[in-house]
Amino acid sequence: MIDRRALLASTLALASCGAGEAPATPPTGPIRPLKAVAPFPVGTVAMSGQLSDQDWFRLVSTHFSQLTPEWEMKMEYILQEDGSLRFDAPDRIAYFARDLGVRLFGHALIWYAQDHPWFTAIVNDRPRFIAEHDRYIAEVAGRWRSQIIGWDVVNEPVEDDGSGYRDCVWSRGLGGIDAYIIRAFEQARIAAPEATLFLNDYNLENTPKKGAAFLRLVERLLKAGAPVQGIGVQSHLDIEIPKGQIASFMNEARQFGLPIHVSELDASLKRGGRLPDLRPRAQRREQQTARVAELAGAFMALPPAQRFAFTVWGVRDSNSWLRRGENDDGQDSPLLFNDEGRPNPLFGVLTEAFAR
């Protein structure tokens, strides 16, 4: 997931984008469970502290058929300073998913943003670095090998602007960009042979240059024999990107024939660092629903075998990572349900798209 960085932006953002779109209104009347409408798994994320929230549980159990641990399956949580591994919180989420009868998706094994001190301290000792890297993947991916149906093996390898690939502790310790990604996938394949292994990134549809760089990387890895088995499209959508840009990327991504996971959907109503947004909220909602409708339509247009899952990065607006921190004014509404758990317009957009 996008962490410790500014809200989504695109060099192609247009202030006029969305003008004339159909009005965005919350659904009325009886609400059908989203998981009953969609012909594929519909996911959301969980933190262990949310599992006892009865209102959150009601929404999750009604509408979703897959769970991704939002943070507590990442290295930042699991790997301790002494090299030991902590599994208390991710185990609770795994048990919760099992008892609820929903799929569990693993996120994420290797991420440039989490260059843990345990690894930075040994980056110049190649044999030890390799051994510790392989041990970590073996123990983490192997722990839930009978339950987890897929993993984000490498998260966010492409530079923000699409100019290249991220230099990180993993590339330095394992001999280069391709080398670290290939090794991570090979080790994940050994540890979790039944899981579908994903390369996951953000802004692929928001920034065409980055989307193209990501797909070139996928092609190169496949030619090198890496067991990349799926494409993770995070879809933290910039609502101001031009119409058709999302569908264009999805059409390019489908050419590999790999399963595609919309893995972290949200759509902020804010401009995030650009000029103050003085437009009426209704206009921004229209843009938001139009872009999410385009994403859902593009996903529905994929061959059924390529529709791995469609995951929303949070349940209620108040659960969103976009609403955390001292600068949150409580006004953003990037998810399917509002703070009180009532459906937002985005819920109706997905219900309509998935029912076609």
What is the predicted function of each stretch?
Residues 19-45:
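C-terminal segment of N-terminal export signals and the immediately downstream linker at the start
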Residues 178-186, 190, 194-196, 211-216, ...:
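Glycoside hydrolase catalytic-domain groove-lining segments
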Residues 1-15:
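N-terminal secretory signal peptides and thylakoid transit peptides that target proteins
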Residues 67, 97, 151, 231, ...:
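Conserved, mostly hydrophobic/aromatic
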Residues 143, 152, 157-162, 166-174, ...:
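Aromatic-rich peripheral "rim/lid" segments of glycoside hydrolase catalytic domains that contact
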Residues 68-72, 92-196, 202-204, 269-272:
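Substrate-binding cleft and catalytic face of glycoside hydrolase catalytic domains
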Residues 36-91, 96, 103, 109-124:
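N-terminal substrate-binding region of glycoside hydrolase catalytic domains
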Residues 45-56, 75-88, 158-160, 204-213, ...:
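Acidic-and-aromatic substrate-binding clefts and catalytic sites of carbohydrate-active enzymes
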